[in-house]
Regions:
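N-terminal secretory signal peptides that target proteins for export/translocation
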Residues: 1-2
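Bacterial N-terminal signal peptides
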Residues: 5-15
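Mitochondrial intermembrane space
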Residues: 20-124
Length: 124
């Protein structure tokens, strides 16, 4: 009998009234001069509203940008910066990189310079 209220509470905590899942990640796609970039930011400790309205809304000059909110980042990333520090604050996120795997030679060192962050190269 007690498990039903707990189940309902769990369901209410992860769904919106419309039935859609609360997003904990955002996929950002950008294009400039024929170059396409796609990454996914997965929230670890950023306040939800700040994550959605700030971190997932990049202001990139002369680029077409599309943002999609998802429950979690999809598989297929060539690299993931785990526990990345967000904007020199205590906030943390995991950043998944898709596209050109050779970009890891720049992204990995930048990731590893952040305190507590670590680079992962998932099996593709």
């Amino acid at each position: 009998m007690r498990s039903l209220p707990l189940l309902l509470l769990l369901l209410l905590s992860v769904t919106l009234p419309s039935g859609s899942v609360i997003a904990d990640a955002c996929i950002i796609s950008s294009r400039a001069k024929g170059v396409e970039v796609e990454l996914c930011q997965e929230n670890r400790s950023i306040p939800r509203e700040l994550f959605r309205s700030g971190y997932c809304q990049p202001q990139l000059v002369d680029q077409q940008v599309a943002v999609r909110f998802v429950a979690s980042c999809p598989n297929g990333a060539f690299g993931i910066c785990r526990n990345a520090q967000a904007a020199n604050l205590a906030y943390r996120q995991d950043v998944h990189y898709y596209g050109v795997a050779s970009d890891a030679r720049f992204l990995r060192p930048a990731c590893e310079q952040q305190p507590g962050a670590r680079w992962e190269s998932p099996q593709r």
